[in-house]
């Protein structure tokens, strides 16, 4: 049952996780972690896509071709592929606070180094290293998943990630203004764009410092180091079984694939939209940046509403409802991406369709992380890292194939046609959602396996020796909370049995295992 302790102005579940997301509060540890996670993620987006915001200026100063600008964009999203996988393991070991601070501090020098680039090679290299900071996404989702109850974790994850993703739009608005302000102050244009990168670089250091000073890893109010000293966090066991649980679960790979064509599509648009509007419609940089920013800024509500819709649909329809709404929403996003490429002769139509496209695309991103926490309790960080990396892989492949164009293996299309085929690809690959099946909840088209309960699914991640040591207890508490994913029909049956009986069943199963 939910409890309200004196020091928390909101209800907690049996794991000490918040059952609400009061975004106006900064209460330790739940809401402070929430705000620190999305702010760090926001800044990683600002810095990663700041070069795309100034692409026309940088392109002219460094004498880059459009193909080279596109390939540099590919390098930016490639940087985070391995970084996200590594960060998933890292946060499972040391906690999200150190993970977030490390991501920011280790990539801040690369942001400053953008002022030193001289040609395509150095430009692409620096974008690669700045892009490593996008692994902040894993810290963001892991931290929120640690702090919020399973019934609202989709909402919490989606709001935090959505507000973080806004950085991809905000930079298109902010960076041209910073550049123009420096230039108006008397600095030559070829120097002004370089000076502009000292702003996000400095903010990286500030946000990392605040994370170390104010962040707390765990709902108990303690960090991972203290919990390990007490023995509370030995429940993770050895690292290899954790990695095996995450990478050995086929659901992780399907979600990584489909996330590559929601978040991956979003990253691709963030990389190309300003240059597209600048070239296609003859706009100046400030106007192209402001209009391009709209796509990313829709994250202020769109990704959050995706998580909310996923959580709401799960109440009557359970996990099967989450899967259905993800497939429908992401398919609609792909369809509107196709339409956007077809209306390239009209700026007004392009912007209107872009807004609709962005809403569905970003809602699908949020819906993915309404499902991800249930794939594996023991390897939540690894699964988050793999799914997050899938977003970057999708972006790298999509941009390399459709938007970078002059190599023999690349397809040389007009930019409008590139949007069309990106949408077709997204619609086709989203079909993979239909193959996700949980034995205790079912899939889009099939029901659960008779007699299988949540405890069975999460207990299989632990060996008999680990169960004997009691290392599985956290997973059993999570299994009990996750019974809410059955939907109304099974939930009424659960209510009839009662929480106590469910806890007894879990204890018996843990003993006999």
Swiss-Prot record:
Q: What InterPro entries has UniProt attached to this entry?
A: MFS (IPR011701), MFS_trans_sf (IPR036259), NO3_transporter (IPR044772), NO3_transporter_NarK/NarU-like (IPR004737)
How this chain sits in the membrane, per its record, is: Multi-pass membrane protein
SUPFAM superfamilies for this protein: MFS general substrate transporter (SSF103473)
- Intracellular or extracellular location(s): Cell membrane
Keyword set for this entry? Cell membrane, Membrane, Nitrate assimilation, Transmembrane, Transmembrane helix, Transport
Chief location: membrane
What GO terms in the biological process aspect are recorded for it? Answer: nitrate assimilation; nitrate transmembrane transport
One cellular component (GO) term of this entry: plasma membrane
The record's induction entry says: Up-regulated after a long nitrate induction period.
Q: Which Pfam families match?
A: MFS_1 (PF07690)
Instruction: Tell me which domain of life the UniProt entry assigns to the organism this sequence originates from.
Output: Eukaryota
Molecular function in Gene Ontology: nitrate transmembrane transporter activity; nitrite transmembrane transporter activity
Family under the similarity heading: Belongs to the major facilitator superfamily. Nitrate/nitrite porter (TC 2.A.1.8) family.
Job of this protein: Involved in nitrate transport, but does not seem to be able to mediate transport by its own. Acts as a dual component transporter with NAR2 (system 2). Involved in a high affinity transport specific for nitrate.
Q: What is this protein called?
A: Nitrate transporter 2.2
Organism in which the protein naturally occurs:
Chlamydomonas reinhardtii
Which taxonomic lineage is given here? Eukaryota, Viridiplantae, Chlorophyta, core chlorophytes, Chlorophyceae
Query: Gene symbol?
Result: NRT2.2
